[in-house]
């Protein structure tokens, strides 16, 4: 599930052109740029708690504004989480950590990361549809190479 969530987010990055990164459907909601930056920050928060027992703060949403700045930060955040997921074992998944003043398992934190990422993927899908862009999860796969006999 994590691979699907991260691939959907990274797929959006590729599909949303630079000129739309400041787009927000209403003034009360985040722009494309703010959503991508928020997801990057959240990767550090959740995977930091699961991997290091503490939230890691990068301040991406507050400090980075452009696609050129946010994309590398998002990719680094995803790589950080890739490492955290790779280190998850049956034994350490059940270890308890603190998240939002609650005691939860490390696996619970990682599951919450997936849910949070997909929540914001849903926001991105709506924004993309409003701009006539087909989101990654609705894009048909490329045709398979035909086999010659």
Describe each PLM feature range.
Residues 1, 5-12, 42, 70-84, ...:
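Alpha-helical packing segments of well-folded alpha/beta enzyme cores
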């Amino acid at each position: 599930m994590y691979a699907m969530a991260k691939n959907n987010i990274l797929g959006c990055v590729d599909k949303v052109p630079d000129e739309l990164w400041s787009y927000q459907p209403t003034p009360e909601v985040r722009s494309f740029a703010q959503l991508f930056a928020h997801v990057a920050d959240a990767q550090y928060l959740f995977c930091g708690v699961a991997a290091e027992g503490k939230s890691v703060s990068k301040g991406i949403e507050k400090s980075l504004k452009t696609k050129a700045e946010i994309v590398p930060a998002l990719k680094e955040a995803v790589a950080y989480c890739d490492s955290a997921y790779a280190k998850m074992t049956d034994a350490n998944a059940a270890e308890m950590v603190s998240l939002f003043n609650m005691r939860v398992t490390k696996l619970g934190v990682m599951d919450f990361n997936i849910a949070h990422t997909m929540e914001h993927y849903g926001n991105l899908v709506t924004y993309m549809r409003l701009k006539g862009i087909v989101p990654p999860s609705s894009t048909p796969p490329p045709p398979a190479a035909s086999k010659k006999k």
